[in-house]
């Protein structure tokens, strides 16, 4: 029998999006707005960017170490995106949730699918851009990728966006502040109807995002 002072299990929020949808910026803003959330830091073989900090944004590791961890079953989920591998440490997540800590996990749709299989009680959220043209403008606006990489990211984004129906909620990032409000409502348990996957017009929007040609 559980005592009255038992610690409640933490909640896990899984957020996924195609590259360029604004996921990272939204997650950072959400963390500032919701102090009870903690960011689950993933491991990656990707090269560290100038503005990133090891242990804050990612744990940057070599291919050999990452593969060793994967083979040892230390990842709750892991996937390869654009030639780089990403993984979520199993112990890190399980210990945090058991202690009552609410976690936010920023991953791709492949990782989200694995998380839902392992922890079906998680809340999964997919972020969509308002249009394919806007997605391309955001990718080009970064100024960090070559033309070849941008074209590849747009192709991968089309496949990513085809998986939006798998998620509990869908947030369209047509306005940063509105998208942030929707994410906050979900985290607070207010269940905003506009972020539901049956949102009016969402099917048409998603179809256009997947099939539209890149802006020339």
What residue ranges belong to the model's regions?
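Post-Walker A helix-loop "phosphate-sensing" segment adjacent to the P-loop in P-loop NTPases
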Residues: 31-40
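Post-Walker A alpha-helix
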Residues: 26-27
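P-loop (Walker A) phosphate-binding loop of NTP-binding proteins
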Residues: 16-18
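Extreme N-terminal, non-catalytic leader segments
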Residues: 1-13, 35
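NTP-dependent small-molecule kinase module
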Residues: 2, 144-145, 159-216
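Conserved lysine of the Walker
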Residues: 23
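ATP-dependent small-molecule kinase phosphotransfer cores
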Residues: 42-103, 109-113
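Conserved phosphate-donor/acceptor-positioning beta-strand/loop module used by diverse small-molecule
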Residues: 103-108, 117-141, 172-173
């Amino acid at each position: 029998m559980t005592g009255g002072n038992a610690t409640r299990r933490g909640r896990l929020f899984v957020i996924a999006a195609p590259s360029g949808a604004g996921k990272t910026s939204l997650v950072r803003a959400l963390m500032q707005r919701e102090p009870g959330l903690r960011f689950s830091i993933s491991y990656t073989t990707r090269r560290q960017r100038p503005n990133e900090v090891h242990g804050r944004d990612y744990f940057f590791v070599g291919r050999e170490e990452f593969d060793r961890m994967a083979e040892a079953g230390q990842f709750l989920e892991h996937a390869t995106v654009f030639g780089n591998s990403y993984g979520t440490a199993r112990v890190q997540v399980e210990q945090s949730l058991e202690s009552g800590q609410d976690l936010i996990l920023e991953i791709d749709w492949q990782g989200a699918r694995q998380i839902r299989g392992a922890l079906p009680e998680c809340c999964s959220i997919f972020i969509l851009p308002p249009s394919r043209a806007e997605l391309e403008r955001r990718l080009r606006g970064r100024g960090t990728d070559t033309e070849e990489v941008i074209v590849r990211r747009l192709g991968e984004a089309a496949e990513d966006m085809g998986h939006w129906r798998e998620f509990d909620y869908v947030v369209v990032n047509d306005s940063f502040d509105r998208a942030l409000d929707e994410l906050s409502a979900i985290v607070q348990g207010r269940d905003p109807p506009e972020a539901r996957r049956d949102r009016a017009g969402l099917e048409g929007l998603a179809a256009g995002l997947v099939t539209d040609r890149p802006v020339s």
